Amino acid sequence: MKIIFMSPKKACLSILYALFTNTRKNEWIGPRVFDVWGLPTKRILKAYKLRLYPTVEQQARIDHTLDCCRFVFNHMLDRQQKIYTRRGEHMSAYDMQKVLTRMKNYLPWLRDADSKALKYACCQVEDAYKHFFKKQCGFPHFKKKRQCAASYTTTKGTSIHIEQRQVKLPLLGWIEARGGKIPDGVIKRATIQRSATGKYYASILM
């Protein structure tokens, strides 16, 4: 075993580097959270909400992705119910995403939506079933077509960028935005929301 001696100052800097960085990717990830025993736990994520002011074309793209996500969610939920009724089994999110890939061959309009958002809709179906079987919520229900308020989540964190009064989102490009100051950090995902009054928002999870 090799023993390395270093000054107290250098030792402190090494500890701080280990706590605040991802040693595999060598990227800054922010402070970690520790439990009562001093052991590291999952880092707390925080969401920041922005008001979006999309153009007419961007609104059409958002609404199209919302409709596609609702369609995929309802379709996968229907398949889940039929499979569970017949065999007492359920599909994983991975299996549903494979079905989604085949669906795009005969439903080409799905290709015009955010692909990551459609995959996330499959994950939402799986999570809804898991929460139901754990008795954490009721049985999953279908999303209504005429529902005014709706949202979809995209997980393309590397494609999401924020600048002063602007946010760049997958498939939409730069959109004018207003809201509080968002600190620099790794963006995990963004949820695009359309309110019942027709306003658009983005919740950025970091």
Question: Language-model segments: what does each one mean?
Answer:
Residues K2-M206:
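Nucleic-acid substrate recognition interfaces
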